[in-house]
Regions:
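C-terminal motif of bacterial Sec signal peptides marking the signal peptidase cleavage site
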Residues: 24-27
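Low-complexity, intrinsically disordered terminal/linker segments enriched in charged
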Residues: 110-208
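Basic amphipathic alpha-helical segments that dock to polyanions
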Residues: 67-83
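Sec-dependent signal peptide recognition
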Residues: 13-19
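Post-signal peptide N-terminal segment of mature Sec-exported envelope proteins
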Residues: 35-57
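Bacterial signal peptide processing site
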Residues: 29-32
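Accessory beta->alpha helical hairpin/"wing" motif in late/C-terminal subdomains of nucleic-acid enzymes
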Residues: 84-124
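N-terminal secretory signal peptides that target proteins for export/translocation
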Residues: 1-11
Length: 208
Protein backbone atom coordinates (compact mmCIF):
# COMPACT_ATOMS: atom_id res chain seq x y z
CA UNK A 1 0.00 0.00 0.00
CA UNK A 2 2.86 2.31 0.91
CA UNK A 3 4.59 1.52 -2.38
CA UNK A 4 1.50 2.46 -4.36
CA UNK A 5 1.18 5.80 -2.52
CA UNK A 6 4.85 6.59 -3.06
CA UNK A 7 4.56 5.85 -6.78
CA UNK A 8 1.46 8.00 -7.07
CA UNK A 9 3.21 10.86 -5.26
CA UNK A 10 6.20 10.69 -7.58
CA UNK A 11 3.91 10.66 -10.59
CA UNK A 12 2.04 13.72 -9.35
CA UNK A 13 5.31 15.51 -8.55
CA UNK A 14 6.62 14.82 -12.04
CA UNK A 15 3.43 16.16 -13.57
CA UNK A 16 3.54 19.32 -11.44
CA UNK A 17 7.18 19.97 -12.33
CA UNK A 18 6.51 19.39 -16.02
CA UNK A 19 3.59 21.82 -16.01
CA UNK A 20 5.64 24.33 -14.01
CA UNK A 21 8.55 24.25 -16.46
CA UNK A 22 6.07 24.56 -19.32
CA UNK A 23 4.56 27.74 -17.91
CA UNK A 24 8.02 29.06 -17.12
CA UNK A 25 9.09 28.43 -20.70
CA UNK A 26 5.98 30.13 -22.05
CA UNK A 27 6.79 33.20 -19.98
CA UNK A 28 10.30 33.58 -21.44
CA UNK A 29 11.18 34.35 -25.03
CA UNK A 30 14.58 33.78 -26.68
CA UNK A 31 15.15 37.56 -26.43
CA UNK A 32 14.99 37.42 -22.61
CA UNK A 33 18.44 35.82 -22.32
CA UNK A 34 21.35 37.83 -23.73
CA UNK A 35 23.55 35.25 -25.39
CA UNK A 36 26.32 35.99 -27.88
CA UNK A 37 24.13 34.62 -30.63
CA UNK A 38 21.26 36.98 -29.75
CA UNK A 39 23.65 39.93 -29.43
CA UNK A 40 25.08 39.13 -32.87
CA UNK A 41 21.60 38.93 -34.40
CA UNK A 42 20.56 42.26 -32.86
CA UNK A 43 23.72 44.00 -34.05
CA UNK A 44 23.71 42.60 -37.60
CA UNK A 45 20.01 43.44 -38.02
CA UNK A 46 20.26 47.02 -36.74
CA UNK A 47 19.67 49.75 -39.32
CA UNK A 48 22.95 51.52 -38.59
CA UNK A 49 24.97 48.34 -39.10
CA UNK A 50 23.17 47.42 -42.32
CA UNK A 51 23.64 50.90 -43.80
CA UNK A 52 26.05 50.58 -46.75
CA UNK A 53 29.07 52.83 -47.08
CA UNK A 54 28.53 55.47 -49.75
CA UNK A 55 31.41 57.10 -51.62
CA UNK A 56 30.69 60.49 -53.18
CA UNK A 57 32.47 61.06 -56.47
CA UNK A 58 32.73 64.66 -57.64
CA UNK A 59 33.59 65.48 -61.23
CA UNK A 60 34.10 68.94 -62.65
CA UNK A 61 36.01 71.69 -60.88
CA UNK A 62 37.40 70.70 -57.45
CA UNK A 63 39.96 72.16 -55.06
CA UNK A 64 43.51 70.89 -54.80
CA UNK A 65 42.71 69.44 -51.36
CA UNK A 66 39.83 67.37 -52.69
CA UNK A 67 41.78 66.22 -55.75
CA UNK A 68 44.59 64.97 -53.50
CA UNK A 69 42.38 63.32 -50.89
CA UNK A 70 43.19 59.65 -50.11
CA UNK A 71 40.10 58.39 -51.95
CA UNK A 72 40.79 60.53 -55.01
CA UNK A 73 44.40 59.35 -55.12
CA UNK A 74 43.22 55.72 -55.16
CA UNK A 75 40.99 56.42 -58.16
CA UNK A 76 43.84 58.25 -59.90
CA UNK A 77 46.23 55.35 -59.38
CA UNK A 78 43.65 52.99 -60.83
CA UNK A 79 43.43 55.26 -63.87
CA UNK A 80 39.72 55.87 -63.34
CA UNK A 81 39.79 59.67 -63.07
CA UNK A 82 41.99 62.33 -64.61
CA UNK A 83 42.38 65.99 -63.70
CA UNK A 84 43.31 69.03 -65.74
CA UNK A 85 44.92 71.95 -63.92
CA UNK A 86 42.63 74.99 -63.80
CA UNK A 87 42.48 78.42 -62.23
CA UNK A 88 40.27 78.45 -59.13
CA UNK A 89 37.09 80.52 -59.26
CA UNK A 90 36.27 82.83 -56.38
CA UNK A 91 35.32 80.85 -53.29
CA UNK A 92 37.01 77.59 -54.27
CA UNK A 93 40.30 77.00 -52.51
CA UNK A 94 43.06 76.10 -51.84
CA UNK A 95 44.55 76.55 -55.32
CA UNK A 96 45.30 75.17 -57.74
CA UNK A 97 42.02 73.67 -58.89
CA UNK A 98 41.38 70.67 -61.09
CA UNK A 99 38.78 69.80 -63.69
CA UNK A 100 38.06 66.15 -62.92
CA UNK A 101 36.49 63.69 -65.33
CA UNK A 102 36.24 59.95 -65.79
CA UNK A 103 38.90 58.36 -67.96
CA UNK A 104 37.91 55.66 -70.50
CA UNK A 105 38.79 53.08 -67.83
CA UNK A 106 36.69 55.00 -65.32
CA UNK A 107 33.71 55.06 -67.64
CA UNK A 108 33.89 51.27 -67.83
CA UNK A 109 34.39 50.77 -64.09
CA UNK A 110 32.32 53.54 -62.53
CA UNK A 111 29.66 54.67 -65.00
CA UNK A 112 27.49 51.54 -64.51
CA UNK A 113 27.44 52.28 -60.77
CA UNK A 114 26.10 55.82 -61.11
CA UNK A 115 23.59 55.34 -63.89
CA UNK A 116 23.20 57.47 -66.97
CA UNK A 117 23.08 60.90 -65.31
CA UNK A 118 24.81 63.60 -67.31
CA UNK A 119 25.31 66.15 -64.51
CA UNK A 120 28.76 66.74 -63.10
CA UNK A 121 28.07 65.18 -59.72
CA UNK A 122 28.63 64.52 -56.92
CA UNK A 123 27.52 60.93 -57.46
CA UNK A 124 26.72 58.63 -54.57
CA UNK A 125 28.10 55.10 -55.03
CA UNK A 126 27.40 52.30 -52.54
CA UNK A 127 30.80 50.66 -52.25
CA UNK A 128 30.90 48.45 -49.13
CA UNK A 129 28.76 46.66 -46.56
CA UNK A 130 29.63 45.80 -42.96
CA UNK A 131 30.00 42.10 -42.12
CA UNK A 132 29.85 40.93 -38.52
CA UNK A 133 32.67 38.56 -37.59
CA UNK A 134 31.58 37.76 -34.07
CA UNK A 135 30.94 38.84 -30.50
CA UNK A 136 34.08 39.03 -28.36
CA UNK A 137 32.58 39.95 -24.99
CA UNK A 138 29.45 40.91 -23.04
CA UNK A 139 29.44 42.95 -19.82
CA UNK A 140 26.03 43.15 -18.12
CA UNK A 141 24.86 45.53 -15.41
CA UNK A 142 21.18 45.30 -14.56
CA UNK A 143 19.10 45.88 -17.67
CA UNK A 144 22.03 47.31 -19.64
CA UNK A 145 24.88 45.50 -21.35
CA UNK A 146 28.01 46.55 -23.25
CA UNK A 147 28.72 44.23 -26.17
CA UNK A 148 32.11 44.16 -27.91
CA UNK A 149 32.17 42.86 -31.47
CA UNK A 150 34.43 42.53 -34.51
CA UNK A 151 33.46 43.42 -38.07
CA UNK A 152 34.96 44.28 -41.46
CA UNK A 153 33.99 46.00 -44.70
CA UNK A 154 32.90 43.72 -47.55
CA UNK A 155 33.31 45.49 -50.93
CA UNK A 156 30.20 45.58 -53.12
CA UNK A 157 32.05 46.33 -56.37
CA UNK A 158 35.52 47.05 -57.74
CA UNK A 159 35.41 50.65 -56.49
CA UNK A 160 34.75 49.35 -52.99
CA UNK A 161 37.54 46.80 -53.38
CA UNK A 162 39.92 49.64 -54.29
CA UNK A 163 38.87 51.87 -51.39
CA UNK A 164 38.38 49.33 -48.59
CA UNK A 165 40.69 46.54 -47.57
CA UNK A 166 38.48 43.60 -46.62
CA UNK A 167 41.32 42.23 -44.49
CA UNK A 168 41.18 45.12 -42.01
CA UNK A 169 39.09 44.18 -38.97
CA UNK A 170 37.39 46.68 -36.68
CA UNK A 171 36.50 46.41 -33.00
CA UNK A 172 33.45 48.24 -31.66
CA UNK A 173 31.41 48.30 -28.47
CA UNK A 174 27.68 49.02 -28.38
CA UNK A 175 25.07 49.24 -25.63
CA UNK A 176 22.07 46.93 -25.40
CA UNK A 177 19.11 47.46 -23.09
CA UNK A 178 16.57 44.98 -21.77
CA UNK A 179 12.89 45.91 -22.13
CA UNK A 180 9.72 44.01 -21.25
CA UNK A 181 9.83 42.30 -24.65
CA UNK A 182 13.54 41.46 -24.57
CA UNK A 183 16.88 43.03 -25.46
CA UNK A 184 17.33 45.83 -27.99
CA UNK A 185 20.25 47.79 -29.43
CA UNK A 186 20.43 51.27 -27.89
CA UNK A 187 19.69 53.86 -30.59
CA UNK A 188 19.54 56.94 -28.35
CA UNK A 189 22.33 58.38 -26.26
CA UNK A 190 22.40 57.57 -22.55
CA UNK A 191 24.74 58.83 -19.85
CA UNK A 192 27.21 55.95 -20.15
CA UNK A 193 26.39 53.77 -23.16
CA UNK A 194 27.27 54.04 -26.85
CA UNK A 195 24.65 53.94 -29.58
CA UNK A 196 25.23 51.77 -32.63
CA UNK A 197 26.16 54.81 -34.76
CA UNK A 198 28.72 55.90 -32.15
CA UNK A 199 30.07 52.36 -31.88
CA UNK A 200 30.70 52.18 -35.62
CA UNK A 201 32.03 55.74 -35.82
CA UNK A 202 34.51 55.07 -33.00
CA UNK A 203 35.57 51.65 -34.28
CA UNK A 204 39.18 50.69 -33.63
CA UNK A 205 41.00 49.32 -36.67
CA UNK A 206 42.90 46.12 -35.93
CA UNK A 207 45.99 44.85 -37.74
CA UNK A 208 45.17 42.04 -40.21
Amino acid sequence: MLGIQTGSFRGCLKTVLTVGFLFLGLGCSPRDFLTRRLAGDLISQSEAFKLPQTFWLTTGLVSNKEFNSPESMVLQRRGWIIGTLQKCPVGLEPPPCWDVELSPLGVTAIRPLIGSETQRGPFGIEVAQRTLEGITGISKAGNFADVEFMWHWAPLNQVGAALYDGGVRYRSMVALREFDDGWRVVNEETHSNQTMEDALRNAEAMAP
